[in-house]
C-alpha cells in the first residue's frame, strides 16, 4: 500500500475513533483531565457516574493534562469519571428560520416553539472584519428616538455603548431602539440577566413581536462559560445575516456581565487580578467581540448597541473605560434626569457619536451643535437662574437658552411608544432653534 494512502487511512481511523480520558481534579469553574491531547477551544464532555453528562470547553492544554470549563454545572462529577472528546471548536446554528426564536448558547431552543430547523452550523469564534474591507460609515441609521437621531445621530455599521447604572432605563431604551429602527434583522443577546427579565423584555420592550428578531439568552444563574459564549453566539448569527447582504441591528445587554463571566474564568485559571479584580483576559475579550460589528464592503452591516452597567454610576470603571475606547460613540444615561422625570434619561452633554458630523447635512449639524451649546449654557448657569441671580440681558446667548428651556426639555422627553421618523426629529429641532 502506498505510504500516502496508509497515512490517510490512519488519519481517518483516529478521527473516527472516540478519544477518552478521565477526570483528575475538579475545581469550582475548571476541571482537569488527562488521556488525550485536545486543543484550546475544543469541546469535551464528562460522562458522570450517575448517568448524566456535562459539556465543557478546553481552556488549558498542557503536555500531561488539560483543563476545561463546564457549560453547565458539575454537581455529581467526581475524579475518575470518563471524559470524551466531542468536536473541534464551538459552533452555533444559523439560518433564516432562527427569526422569532429564543436560544441558549448551546444552540438549544428555549421558547417551546418546537424543533429548530436551521441552515448550517457556523463557528462561534471568527476574526473581525479586516480593516481595509470595512465600508465607510456614510448612511444614517435611524432609531426612532429623537434625542439620539437629532443630537447623537448613528450611522449604519456604527458601534455604540449605552452606559448607565442599574435601574436607570437601559432595557427600555434598547427596546425603543429595537422597535424604532428600520433594520430588517435584529439580533439580541441578553447576557447575565435575571430570569424574570427575559419574558419582560420580550413582552414589554419588544411588545411581543419577535418576527424579525433572534434572541440568544444566558441568564445570571448560567455558568460563566455560557454567559461568555452567549455574546459570541449572537454575534455569529448577526454575521450570517450580514454576509447575506442585510443590515442587522445587534443589541447586547450587558457587556459588564459578559466581562464578569470572563473574570470568573480567568481567576479560576490563576490570572492575576488587576483593576477592580478584572484579569487581563477580561479586558482583551471586549475588542474580540465588538470589532466583529461594522459595515463590510459588498456585504451588509451590523450596527451594534452594547449596554454597559456602570457600577455606582462610575464612568471610570475599567470595563466602561475599555468599552469607550473601542466603540464609535457612547450614550450616557443619567440617574439625575430620571429624578426630573426626563425619559429616556440621556445626558446629551456627556454623550457623543463619533460619526454624526459625517453623515448628516451641514444645516443639521448646525442645529445639533446649537442645541447642545444652549443646553450646556443652561446647565452651567442653572444655580444662578434658580436663585434669581441672573439678570436677563447680561448674556444674549444665555437669554436665548432660558427662553427655549421648556422647548428643549420637551424635545428630550419621549414616550417609549411614541417613536418617530428621522426627518421629524430634525424638523422639531429647527422649530425650537428658530
Curated annotation (Swiss-Prot):
It is an enzyme of class 7 (translocase). ATP binds at residues 164-171. GO terms for biological process: bacterial-type flagellum organization; protein secretion by the type III secretion system. Keywords: ATP synthesis, ATP-binding, Bacterial flagellum biogenesis, Bacterial flagellum protein export, Cytoplasm, Hydrogen ion transport, Ion transport, Nucleotide-binding, Protein transport, Translocase, Transport. Pfam families: ATP-synt_ab (PF00006), T3SS_ATPase_C (PF18269). Belongs to the ATPase alpha/beta chains family. This is Flagellum-specific ATP synthase. The gene is fliI.
Amino acid at each position: 500500500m502506498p505510504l500516502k494512502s496508509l497515512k490517510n487511512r490512519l488519519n481517518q481511523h483516529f478521527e473516527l475513533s472516540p478519544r477518552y480520558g478521565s477526570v483528575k481534579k475538579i475545581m469550582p469553574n475548571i476541571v482537569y483531565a488527562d488521556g488525550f491531547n485536545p486543543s484550546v477551544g475544543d469541546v469535551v464532555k464528562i460522562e458522570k457516574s450517575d448517568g448524566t453528562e456535562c459539556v465543557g470547553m478546553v481552556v488549558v492544554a498542557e503536555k500531561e493534562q488539560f483543563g476545561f470549563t463546564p457549560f453547565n454545572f458539575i454537581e455529581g462529577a467526581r475524579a475518575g469519571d470518563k471524559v470524551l472528546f466531542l468536536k473541534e471548536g464551538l459552533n452555533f446554528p444559523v439560518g433564516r428560520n432562527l427569526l422569532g426564536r429564543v436560544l441558549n448558547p448551546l444552540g438549544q431552543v428555549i421558547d417551546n416553539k418546537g424543533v429548530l430547523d436551521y441552515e448550517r452550523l457556523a463557528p462561534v469564534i471568527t476574526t473581525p472584519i479586516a480593516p481595509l474591507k470595512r465600508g465607510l460609515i456614510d448612511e444614517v441609521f435611524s432609531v426612532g428616538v429623537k434625542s439620539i437621531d437629532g443630537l447623537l445621530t448613528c450611522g449604519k455599521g456604527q458601534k455604540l455603548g449605552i452606559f448607565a447604572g442599574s435601574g436607570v432605563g437601559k432595557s427600555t431604551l434598547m427596546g425603543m431602539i429595537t422597535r424604532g429602527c428600520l433594520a430588517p434583522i435584529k439580533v439580541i443577546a441578553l447576557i447575565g440577566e435575571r430570569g424574570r427579565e427575559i419574558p419582560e423584555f420580550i413582552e414589554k420592550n419588544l411588545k411581543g413581536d419577535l418576527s424579525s428578531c433572534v434572541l440568544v439568552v444566558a441568564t445570571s444563574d448560567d455558568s460563566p462559560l455560557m454567559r461568555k459564549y452567549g455574546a459570541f453566539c449572537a454575534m455569529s448569527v448577526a454575521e450570517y445575516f450580514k454576509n447575506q447582504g442585510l443590515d442587522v441591528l445587534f443589541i447586547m445587554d450587558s457587556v459588564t456581565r459578559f466581562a464578569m463571566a470572563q473574570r470568573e474564568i480567568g481567576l479560576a485559571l490563576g490570572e492575576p487580578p488587576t483593576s477592580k479584580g478584572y484579569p487581563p483576559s477580561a479586558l482583551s475579550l471586549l475588542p474580540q467581540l465588538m470589532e466583529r460589528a461594522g459595515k463590510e464592503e459588498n456585504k451588509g452591516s451590523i450596527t451594534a448597541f452594547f449596554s454597559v452597567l456602570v457600577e455606582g454610576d462610575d464612568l471610570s470603571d475599567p470595563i466602561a473605560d475599555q468599552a469607550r475606547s473601542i466603540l464609535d460613540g457612547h450614550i450616557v444615561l443619567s440617574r439625575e434626569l430620571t429624578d426630573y422625570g426626563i425619559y429616556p434619561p440621556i445626558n446629551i452633554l456627556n454623550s457623543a457619536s463619533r460619526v454624526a458630523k459625517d453623515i448628516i447635512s451641514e444645516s443639521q449639524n448646525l442645529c445639533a451643535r446649537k442645541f447642545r451649546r444652549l443646553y450646556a449654557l443652561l446647565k452651567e448657569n442653572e444655580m444662578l437662574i434658580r436663585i434669581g441671580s441672573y439678570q436677563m440681558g447680561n448674556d444674549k446667548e444665555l437669554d436665548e437658552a432660558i427662553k427655549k428651556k421648556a422647548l428643549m426639555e420637551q424635545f428630550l422627553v419621549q414616550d417609549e411608544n411614541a417613536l418617530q421618523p428621522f426627518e421629524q426629529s430634525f424638523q422639531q429641532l429647527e422649530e425650537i432653534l428658530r
